[in-house]
């Protein structure tokens, strides 16, 4: 019997079935804009599909020019672009997975001078004041979302996720904080939620019934002038009526000052918010944020907080997270420690994302570790994270590795870092390497 019966249970959506309750959450990784990026994304996502993820969601792709994060950012609004995405969908399907494209219009968070919003109110984290969309432009933006979804379907995606959370354009229409309009798209709450409802309704019309539509709903804005719980529930019901297959629950705007994914945030700290929506809608609910072990994911599902667990960064840290859980090898999972140093920090610095504990992430086409034709005897001086990482990869390739460590424990300066309040997750990396050494006969620690 599985140790994770809820997590590994299939989910019947009527027209299709997800093989388990694990969703790889959306992350922009920077491959979307680089030369050869589609081939690299294909390898990146395919490896996670082979690792057992039930449904993958891509990084955010804009439905038009105004919604890109920066000039030259990734978008999908022409058939020629859809053809490129077929590299990704074919690779994922060949690996036995399913994948949805996230449609993200960044609104006033766009870092270019032609950004737009419901009202001309500058974001505190952006130097550029947005242009307020006219009513005609609002209608065109709705059509652009539907067109992007149709192109995603043509490209072979199994569905789309409509990003309505985290303070991006859709969320900006919903919140009184950012919507000061006095037309049909502003004023009353019913008017402010017309934009997301119309996007979902038009998208469903465009793609038909047998296509997954996930709507990412902001459950907790964590900013002044955000939605109340009663308003969120009202919107969720309308989104369900409009045709959403699944609702994903988002937490916090990017300008919010309350941490939501940092390592000091307790595991599964926000699943209680998702549970508030349970019973109000019939579609499956996704919860997320700081769920990084199969044990925690199982607990969240078992207590009825949600139907699906979204894990984004944990899939950077270990592409075979789900497979290891299925095979009773959860102690071999390379756990995400929530440091954000090589994922978010890289993206904010305009670099390709990777992972502090798994530097191969997003470099699957470059770092290909095959068995070495000649086994060598290799000495590694120091059992810090770098030495441990090299030693385990070298041993996996067939080399005989001896690690020389002066202290009585592995980990180097990680042993200092893990003692800092809020950095307890760093223990997980040392646990992972300790287990790797125990299981790898090619490594000797002296």
Predicted regions and their residues:
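N-terminal glycine-rich dinucleotide-binding loop that anchors FAD/FMN and/or NAD(P) in oxidoreductases
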Residues: 333, 338, 416-445
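Flavin-dependent oxidoreductase catalytic cores
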Residues: 1-381, 385-401, 406-409, 413-415
């Amino acid at each position: 019997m599985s140790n994770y019966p809820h997590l590994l249970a299939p989910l019947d959506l009527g027209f299709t079935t997800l093989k388990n309750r694990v969703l790889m959450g959306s992350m922009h990784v920077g491959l979307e804009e680089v030369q050869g990026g589609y081939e690299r994304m294909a390898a990146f996502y395919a490896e996670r599909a082979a690792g057992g993820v039930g449904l993958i969601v891509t990084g955010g792709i804009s439905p038009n020019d105004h919604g890109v994060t920066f000039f030259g950012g990734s978008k999908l609004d022409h058939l020629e672009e859809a053809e490129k995405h077929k590299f990704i969908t074919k690779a994922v399907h060949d690996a036995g997975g399913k994948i949805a494209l996230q449609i993200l219009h960044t609104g006033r968070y766009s870092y270019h001078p032609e950004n737009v919003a419901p009202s001309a109110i500058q974001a505190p984290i952006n130097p550029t004041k947005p242009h307020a969309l006219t009513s005609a432009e609002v209608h065109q933006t709705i059509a652009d979302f539907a067109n992007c979804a149709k192109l995603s379907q043509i490209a072979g995606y199994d569905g789309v996720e409509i990003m309505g959370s985290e303070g991006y354009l859709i969320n900006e229409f919903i919140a009184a904080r950012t919507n000061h309009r006095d037309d049909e798209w502003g004023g009353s709450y019913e008017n402010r939620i017309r934009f997301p409802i119309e996007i979902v309704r038009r998208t469903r019309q465009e793609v038909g019934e047998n296509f997954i539509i996930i709507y990412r709903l902001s459950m907790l804005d964590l900013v002044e002038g955000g939605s109340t719980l009663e308003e969120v529930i009202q919107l969720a019901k309308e989104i369900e009526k409009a045709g959403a297959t699944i609702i994903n629950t988002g937490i916090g705007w990017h300008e919010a000052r309350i941490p939501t994914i940092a390592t000091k945030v307790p595991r599964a700290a926000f699943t209680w918010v998702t549970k508030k929506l349970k019973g109000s809608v019939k579609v499956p609910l996704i919860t997320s944020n700081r769920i990084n072990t199969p044990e925690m994911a199982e607990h969240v599902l078992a207590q009825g907080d949600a139907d699906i667990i979204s894990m984004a960064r944990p899939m950077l840290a270990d592409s075979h997270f789900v497979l290891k859980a299925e095979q009773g090898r959860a102690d071999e999972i390379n756990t995400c420690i929530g440091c954000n140093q090589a994922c978010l920090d890289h993206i904010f610095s305009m670099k390709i994302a990777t992972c502090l504990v798994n530097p191969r992430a997003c470099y699957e086409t470059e770092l290909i570790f095959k068995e070495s034709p000649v086994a060598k005897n290799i000495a590694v001086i120091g059992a810090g994270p770098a030495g441990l990482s090299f030693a385990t990869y070298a041993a996996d390739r067939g080399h005989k590795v001896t690690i020389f460590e002066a202290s009585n424990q592995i980990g180097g300066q990680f042993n200092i870092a893990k003692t800092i309040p809020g950095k307890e997750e760093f223990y997980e990396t040392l646990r992972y390497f300790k287990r790797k050494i125990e299981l790898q006969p090619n490594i000797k620690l002296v």
